[in-house]
A protein has these predicted regions:
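N-terminal Rossmann-like FAD-binding beta1-loop-alpha1 element of flavoenzymes
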Residues: 1-23
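Short hydrophobic core segments
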Residues: 2, 176-187, 321
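Active-site substrate-recognition segment that forms the wall
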Residues: 13-17, 27, 40, 79-81, ...
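Dinucleotide-binding Rossmann-like beta1-alpha1 core, especially the glycine-rich loop
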Residues: 40-120
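Short beta-strand to alpha-helix junction loop
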Residues: 53-59, 89-98, 136-155, 253-257, ...
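Helical element adjacent to the flavin cofactor pocket in flavoenzyme catalytic cores
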Residues: 135-172, 179, 183
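C-terminal catalytic lobe of FAD-dependent flavoproteins
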Residues: 272-349
Length: 349
C-alpha cells in the first residue's frame, strides 16, 4: 500500500482480513486530506443532474457505511458517527429552484429527498437564519468524525497484522511486493505517469461552542452564499465549517480571505456562529479527477489504483476498500465499474 489516509488504511485493513500480508508505506500517515475532511456522507445532497455515475457510486458506498462503521467502532472503541441527516438550504428564489430540480432528479434515480418549508425548517433547526425559504432533507445521510475514523482504521490495521513503513515511495515498481496499491491522494499523479489527478485546495474551520451560545444544528447544513458552497457539520462540542475550493498547486497555507469567507458564509446560514470559539484553521488538497469519479482499478499486472476521490474520500472509503480487495482477488466489483481507470488513457508500467 502506498498511502496511509482513510482510503489506504481501509484497503489495508480489508486486504489483511482477506488474507493478504500488507505493508503501508507513508512518511506521515493521515496528515493529508483525510485529516482535514468534513466527514460528510452525503451523495444525495451533493448530487447534480447529469452526474448519474457519481451519485450511484456514492450511494453504493453510503449503503455500506452502517455495517462498516459499526465494525470499526466495535474493533477500536472509537465513536465515529457525529450526526444523522443532511439539510441543504436555499436563501433565494434561484437556490430554491435548484433544490426542486435536484429533488426531482434524485427521485428519478430511485432515491428520496424531502422538501421542507420555512416553518418546517425553523421547527427542525431553530438556530438557522429565519430568511431561509426552502430546504432539502436527506434523512439517510450522516457525518462521521474523520479523525476518529483515522484512529479506528489504524487500530483495525494493527489488529489485523498490517505493517507500517514511515517512508515515501517514488517508484511503485521498485517495491518487493506481489501487488501494489497506489492510494496516495494528490501524490498519486507523481507515482503513475499521466494519471489525471490534480490537487484542489480546501480550507476548513473547527469551531467550539462557548457557554450560553445557541447549540449547533443537529445535522449537517449545506448552502450556497454568493455562489460559494458552505457546510456546517456537527462535531462534538462544536462545528466543522468548510470548505473553500482553489486550484493553487500544492499550496496548503490557510489564507485570511478563505477564513473570512467561511465565517461570513456560515454566519449567513447560522447567525449565532459568530459567538463560537475559532479553534482551528486548516487546509488540505483534494485529489480531483476530471469527471468527479474516483479512479479505482487495475492498471498493470502488479499495480491497482485507488485515488481521485476528490471531496468524497470519507464517503467512498468502504466501497473503495471492497473494490480494491475484489480487484486483488481477480473479481472486480460491479458497483465500482464506472470508476475504472479504463475510461482514461495514460501510461502503463
Amino acid at each position: 500500500m502506498i498511502g496511509g489516509g482513510a482510503i489506504g488504511l481501509s484497503i489495508a485493513w480489508r486486504a489483511a482480513q482477506a488474507g493478504w500480508s500488507v505493508t503501508v508505506h507513508d512518511p506521515a500517515p493521515a496528515s493529508g486530506a483525510s485529516w482535514v475532511a468534513g466527514g460528510m456522507l452525503a451523495p444525495l445532497s451533493e448530487g447534480w443532474p447529469g452526474e448519474d455515475a457519481v451519485l450511484q457510486v456514492g450511494a453504493a458506498s453510503l449503503a455500506r457505511w452502517p455495517d462498516f462503521g459499526a465494525e470499526l467502532e466495535t474493533l477500536s472503541g472509537e465513536t465515529l458517527f457525529t450526526s444523522h441527516g443532511s439539510l441543504t438550504v436555499a436563501l433565494d428564489a434561484a437556490d430554491a429552484a435548484d433544490l426542486r430540480t435536484v429533488a426531482e432528479w434524485i427521485a428519478g434515480q430511485g432515491y428520496e429527498l424531502e422538501l421542507l418549508s420555512r416553518a418546517q425548517i425553523r421547527a427542525a433547526q431553530p438556530s438557522l437564519a429565519p430568511n431561509i425559504r426552502l430546504a432539502l432533507l436527506a434523512a439517510t445521510e450522516s457525518a462521521v468524525d474523520n479523525r476518529a475514523l483515522i484512529a479506528a482504521l489504524r487500530s483495525a490495521c494493527v489488529a489485523a497484522g498490517v505493517e507500517f513503513v514511515a517512508e515515501a515511495v517514488t517508484d511503485p515498481g521498485a517495491l518487493a511486493a506481489d501487488q501494489v496499491v497506489v492510494s496516495a491522494g494528490t501524490a498519486s499523479a507523481r507515482l503513475w505517469p499521466g494519471l489525471p489527478v490534480r490537487p484542489v485546495k480546501g480550507e476548513i474551520l473547527r469551531l467550539h461552542r462557548r457557554p450560553g451560545v445557541a447549540p449547533a444544528p443537529t445535522m449537517t447544513i449545506r448552502g450556497s452564499v454568493h455562489g460559494r458552497p458552505v457546510y456546517l457539520v456537527p462535531r462534538g462540542d462544536g462545528l466543522v465549517v468548510g470548505a473553500t475550493q482553489h486550484e493553487s498547486g500544492e499550496d496548503t497555507q490557510v489564507t485570511v480571505a478563505g477564513v473570512r469567507d467561511l465565517i461570513a458564509d456560515a454566519q449567513t446560514l447560522m447567525p449565532s456562529i459568530g459567538e463560537y470559539e475559532l479553534h482551528e484553521c486548516a487546509a488540505g488538497l483534494r485529489p480531483m479527477s476530471p469527471d468527479n469519479l474516483p479512479i479505482i482499478g487495475r492498471v498493470s499486472d502488479r499495480v491497482v489504483l485507488a485515488t481521485g476521490h476528490g471531496r468524497n474520500g470519507v464517503l467512498l472509503t468502504p466501497l473503495t476498500a471492497d473494490a480494491v480487495v475484489a480487484e486483488l482477488d481477480g473479481a472486480p466489483l460491479a458497483e465500482a465499474k464506472s470508476a475504472s481507470p479504463e475510461r482514461f488513457t495514460f501510461n502503463d508500467e
